[in-house]
């Protein structure tokens, strides 16, 4: 009984906290779907999108040490090159 009351109070507190902390300064819920997909997309790719996701054959791959860059296709990073 005591645990149940504590759980109910905790859920009510967290729900109230969520509503208080929600940023709805621009009436975000009403404007959530107002823009079309084309208007929401950035016409120019960002720097992250321009970056290669994988290294090609004979490319430098320091990712073997850091774990960031991987080789494309079935290639493996041997030393510092994708082979």
Curated annotation (Swiss-Prot):
Disulfide bonds join 54-72, 61-77, 71-82. Mu-conotoxins block voltage-gated sodium channels (Nav). Residues 23-50 form a propeptide. This is Mu-conotoxin-like PnMKLT1-014. Keywords: Cleavage on pair of basic residues, Disulfide bond, Ion channel impairing toxin, Knottin, Neurotoxin, Secreted, Signal, Toxin, Voltage-gated sodium channel impairing toxin. One of its GO terms (molecular function) is toxin activity. Expressed by the venom duct. The keyword Ligase does not apply. GO terms for cellular component: extracellular region. The presence of a 'disulfide through disulfide knot' structurally defines this protein as a knottin. The cysteine framework is VI/VII (C-C-CC-C-C). Pfam families: Conotoxin. Belongs to the conotoxin O1 superfamily. It is found in: Secreted. Its main location: secreted. Residues 1-22 form the signal peptide.
